[in-house]
Amino acid sequence: MTERRPDLIPAWVDGTLTPVDKLRAHQEGLRHKAVSVFVVRGREILMQRRAMGKYHTPGLWANTCCTHPEWDETAKDCATRRLEEELGITGVSPVYRDTIEYRADVGGGLIEHEVVDLFTGRASPEMTVVPNPDEVM
């Protein structure tokens, strides 16, 4: 089993997908992979507010979960893992919907240039959410 390296994310350097330090990717505005998940229950969408300790966009309201896959991690595995790590959500099977790309200055000298795999998941009426205070408010 490979040791987890959450600091290394897939980013393109000179046209080649390469493991890159997450902070470097944002400082240099490197095009990199990301994952975005929207969990729905009926007509409701679960949103979260980013923790104030996050190194960029703290306190920002966002979708259910947005993150970066680790190097050698599939987008779907990443989505499932981060739902549990950020919100304590299990039993939701993310379904791939589309891929988008965007570039945005997020302040503090950081740039998001993401190729985002979008997922949705259906929540049961009895689903519980246990927010991780290091991740969400």
Language-model features: where?
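Residues that flank catalytic or metal-binding motifs in active/ligand-binding sites
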Residues: 7, 33-35, 65, 96, ...
